[in-house]
Amino acid sequence: HWRCLPGQGDLNLSGFMRALAATGYDGVLSLEIFNDRFRAGSARSVALDGHRSLIWLLDETARQVGKSVPGAVPMPPPAPVEAVEFIEFAVSEAERPGFERLLRALGFARAGAHRSKDVDLWKQGDIRIVLNSEADGFAHSYQITHGTSVCALALRVPDAQAAIARATALLDVPHAGAVGPGELDIPAVRGLGGSLLYFLDHTSALGRWAEVDFEATGEASDHAGLTGVDHVSQSMQYEEMLTWLLFYSSLFETRKTPSQ
């Protein structure tokens, strides 16, 4: 007896909504607080998930019927994820030397130094890892809270501005970081655990983020056979799973696959 919000389960609600739209129905939609876990959870989180699920459902219905439906919020379509552009770690100054030794042992090279921040770019194949040891700002706060860990993930999509517009329409929280002169303002939203999710594309200046924001060191990689990032796995509290499932599935062009 599994009760969850639209977009969190497997029931074809968009098909039901398509049939409902064909009748000309333009009334209200409502959600019941379905299960005891929702009732015992954060009222704010459940309310946000419920609101987001209805926004997604109406958008999905409009796309399937090929016209606007009452209540649908105009937004760009879900974005296919083309690649992981970089993975950013918040690292303390004390732990940074050991982290750098680990990266070198894995065949990574320090390919760039940020033009204005205590941030380095490490590279091997198509894998880019950013080490951020800034003494203030988002990464510093994240490191204090979580320790040395991944603080941001950058995904390449066809249109970064369209992705951030869809994210905003779906009630995701935009993040505005400090941007120095001549540096890129990379669109981002808050993600799991307070981390950041950046959007990049290859059709705008954002596609040159590495050369714009970093000075090349010329250091060559001692290649260890690592070529790219083939998947991303995130750990969370059991109670958060449905929230973040909806976050990703409503924002991106995704499909569910059986777990191993």
What are these regions (language model features)?
Residues 56, 66-112, 123-176, 183, ...:
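Glyoxalase I/VOC metalloenzyme domain signal
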Residues 33, 116, 179-180:
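Residue-level "edge-of-site" marker
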Residues 1-75:
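Histidine-acidic metal/acid-base catalytic patches
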Residues 38-50, 117-134:
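Accessory recognition modules or surfaces
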